[in-house]
Amino acid sequence: MQRLRWLLLLIVVLVIGASFVLVKLPLQLGLDLRGGAQLTIEVQPTKEIPQIDNDSLVAVKTVIENRVNALGVSEPLVQTAGEDKIVVQLPGVTDPGQAERILGGTAQLEFQQQRPGTEGEFQAEYSIKRQLDAELENLRRSGASPENSDRLEELIKAKEESNKALLALFEPMGLTGKNLTDARPSPNQSGTAWEVALRFDEEGGQKFAELTQAVAGTGRSLGVFLDNDLISAPVVGVEFANTGITGGAAVITGNFTIDTANDLAVQLRGGSLPFPVEVVENRTVGATLGQESIRRSLVAGFVGLVLVLVFMAVYYRLPGIVADISLMIYAVLTLAAFALVGVTLTLPGIAGFILSIGMAVDANVLIFERTREELRAGNTLYRSVEAGFFRAFSSILDSNVTTLIACAALFWFGSGLVKGFALTLAIGVMVSLFTALTCSRTLLLVIVLSLPKVRQNPRLFCPNLSSVTAKS
């Protein structure tokens, strides 16, 4: 009995802890429940590869997945559509423009050295580029208008010409974004602006040292190009003329805000796209769909749960009421587990949760039927309850293990919503195993051992029991 009291205390503590978790860590909802951004990205062929094949599409999809993961979006969906398109769903994203900038940019980073004898021409071209960048930024902030649209188109063409002119003043040195191991936004030393801190691999660190050594003290710039756009052109001091900048680290400075620095860092961490892409659709999934889905799901789940609770109480009497209490404990513990693990609830995920409730009920049904068989065989109520749990254990364990194996296969080979379904079902199955074999058993045995009137009235467990010798 002492052991049962400790188990009962453990159950109470778990329920209180789970309730606290649910208050402090609200459940995350997926795109279909709370809205977000959905982008359709079209992969563009090149002169070298005029036809996009499946391998090319998968390569682009992998890079986009890396960028999405770097964004920190929970339960994203990235999947191919047709021969040259990729659909990206980002739950909870409130700035689809940022998502388009990060996912749509090729992000081909390259470090180049300025050619000797081009100092004067570079200063003139770089000044023009900065003026164009400033005017472009002002136009974008001022919003769309017919006049702005025409001027914006002119500025974009002028910037393309400026980029070509600047690119001709530099020469590649073989140092690209492929040599990066990390990229993070960070404030500069004065704390007044933002920059992007880079970390190179061993080969990249050596190349960066050679590149900085080549331009150190010459007055020529080290060009940092992103998609052939010169984003930074620092001059390396003469103190690095002998060894270059060693250590395998560098920073990209420029006119960065915290948002633009983070966007660039995310792109660089995700890797460059092997093909140019175009975002052909960028739409926001409204909250109305999410609210309607939540309402219908909650109604369906509530009605189903009430019917199950009523059936268990009517058909199984006292054990059924105990099972109902266990089911409520199960619901609290499972939702808390979802919050702790970071599960994002989608409609398929809710379906997995409801299915796991059915499996929890099934476990209790097996236990109570075995208990009734023991009572009909003439055993005492206490022994019948213990034997019922013991005899049902192997069947319950087998069914739950096979379900978990299926969940593992779905999670391993599936993607997106299928993974969400598998994860919620697996968590629900594991929690249901605990509640059925621990919570239900503990509550029943405490009632039987603590209440003599219950112990002497086995018909509370088996209504049509003819006669049973009630023993303490």
From Swiss-Prot:
Q: Which domain of life is it from?
A: Bacteria
- Spell out the subcellular localization from the entry: Cell inner membrane
Any one Gene Ontology MF annotation carried by this entry is: protein-transporting ATPase activity
What is its membrane topology? Multi-pass membrane protein
Q: Which InterPro entries match?
A: Acrflvin-R, SecD, SecD/SecF_arch_bac, SecD/SecF_CS, SecD_1st, SecD_SecF_C, SecD_SecF_C_bact, SecDF_P1_head
The GO biological-process annotations, alphabetized, read as: intracellular protein transmembrane transport; protein targeting; protein transport; protein transport by the Sec complex
State the SUPFAM superfamilies in the record: Multidrug efflux transporter AcrB transmembrane domain
Membrane-crossing residue ranges in chain numbering: 7-27, 298-318, 326-345, 349-368, 392-414, 432-452
Main localisation: membrane
The protein's UniProt keywords, in alphabetical order, are:
Cell inner membrane, Cell membrane, Membrane, Protein transport, Translocation, Transmembrane, Transmembrane helix, Transport
State if Membrane is listed as a keyword. Answer: yes
The Gene Ontology CC terms held by the record are: plasma membrane
Q: Which family does it belong to?
A: Belongs to the SecD/SecF family. SecD subfamily.
Q: What does this protein do?
A: Part of the Sec protein translocase complex. Interacts with the SecYEG preprotein conducting channel. SecDF uses the proton motive force (PMF) to complete protein translocation after the ATP-dependent function of SecA.
Q: Which HAMAP family match?
A: SecD_B
The UniProt subunit note reads as follows: Forms a complex with SecF. Part of the essential Sec protein translocation apparatus which comprises SecA, SecYEG and auxiliary proteins SecDF. Other proteins may also be involved.
Name the chain's protein: Protein translocase subunit SecD
Q: Which organism is it from?
A: Synechocystis sp. (strain ATCC 27184 / PCC 6803 / Kazusa)
Instruction: State which gene encodes it.
Output: secD
